[in-house]
């Protein structure tokens, strides 16, 4: 099972101090989806977080055996999360990435758990206790590389019962009084993501215009790209829970159930072919100008 979830710090009552009631739909959805997945035979939870360590040219997988973190950054240091890492699965994902020439692994520094990791686990821990974790960051690499890395995860988890959580808020510019003010790209981006979730249209995660993405001030897209790769050639049933953005940031929750194989959903290869065709068209167009010159 996989899911896309947001990570607003104020959803934690000790941080929100009552303000969290404004996003009650998100809280109810979080409770519902985590309650549901707790009935599944989960051994390991993979969390992809935009707030874990991020490099421009390398996807970081947290090393070590154990990690912890708290919300002292948000004045709630008493709320603490501890995890044991699935070192065996970390090794398998790293090996798969190396085999497929994706720059990913456990090199570099590590730090305490980030809020993009802890908030989903805060809700999961209410219903499920005995599991290990793999924590993965995002990078400045291309959309297709994030998708291909997701395929490495898929290869590595073949014989394992895994829950994959793609942590990420949507646009941060939905309202004038939001963190980045209002930009028209914000609601448009959120609409496109919600539609893509509802239709399991993972190609959409790869095809956004980079300037549009920058203007939308989004957070979760690369997490979703990795998740999409992990579901490559899988038959998917989407379970959309909720969407709201009262503070000017989009919070959406959607789960994806795997219902078997679907070889037509080789979205990475379809995207690559699409890009090659576009480059070919541009080149042909350039050739016309060269001839005219």
Which residues fall in each region the model found?
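Flexible, D/E/H-enriched segments
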Residues: 1-43, 55-151, 177-291
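Structural motif
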Residues: 44-46, 163
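Glycine-rich N-terminal segment of FAD-binding domains in flavoprotein oxidoreductases
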Residues: 50-51, 176
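Catalytic metal-binding/acid-base residues of hydrolase active sites
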Residues: 51-53, 170-171
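Non-transmembrane, aqueous-exposed alpha-helical and coiled segments at domain scale
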Residues: 151-157, 162
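Short, flexible coil/turn micro-motifs enriched in small/turn-prone residues
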Residues: 163-164, 215
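Acidic/histidine-rich, metal-coordinating catalytic segments
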Residues: 164-173
């Amino acid at each position: 099972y996989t899911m896309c979830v947001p990570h607003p710090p104020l959803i934690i009552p000790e941080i929100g101090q009552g303000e969290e009631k404004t996003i009650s739909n998100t809280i109810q959805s979080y409770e519902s989806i985590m309650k549901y997945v707790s009935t599944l035979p989960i051994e390991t939870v993979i969390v992809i977080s935009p707030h874990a360590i991020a490099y421009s040219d390398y996807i970081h997988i947290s090393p070590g055996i154990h990690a912890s973190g708290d919300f002292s950054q948000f004045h709630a240091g008493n709320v603490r999360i501890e995890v044991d890492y699935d070192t065996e699965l970390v090794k398998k994902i790293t090996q798969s990435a190396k085999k497929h020439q994706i720059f990913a692994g456990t090199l570099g520094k590590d730090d305490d758990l980030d809020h993009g990791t802890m908030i989903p686990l805060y809700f999961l821990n209410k219903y499920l206790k005995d599991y290990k974790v793999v924590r993965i960051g995002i990078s400045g690499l291309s959309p297709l590389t994030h998708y291909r890395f997701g395929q490495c995860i898929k290869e590595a988890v073949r014989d394992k019962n895994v829950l994959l959580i793609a942590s990420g808020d949507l646009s941060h510019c939905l309202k004038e009084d939001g963190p980045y003010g209002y930009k028209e790209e914000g609601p448009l981006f959120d609409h496109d993501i919600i539609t893509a979730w509802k239709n399991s249209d993972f190609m959409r995660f790869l095809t956004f215009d980079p300037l549009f993405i920058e203007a939308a001030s989004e957070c979760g897209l690369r997490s979703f790209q990795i998740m999409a790769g992990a579901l490559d050639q899988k038959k998917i049933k989407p379970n959309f829970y909720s969407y709201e953005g009262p503070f000017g940031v989009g919070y959406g929750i959607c789960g994806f159930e795997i219902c078997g194989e679907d070889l037509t959903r080789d979205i990475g290869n379809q995207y690559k072919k699409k890009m090659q065709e576009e480059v070919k068209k541009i080149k042909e167009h350039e050739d016309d100008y060269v001839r005219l010159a």
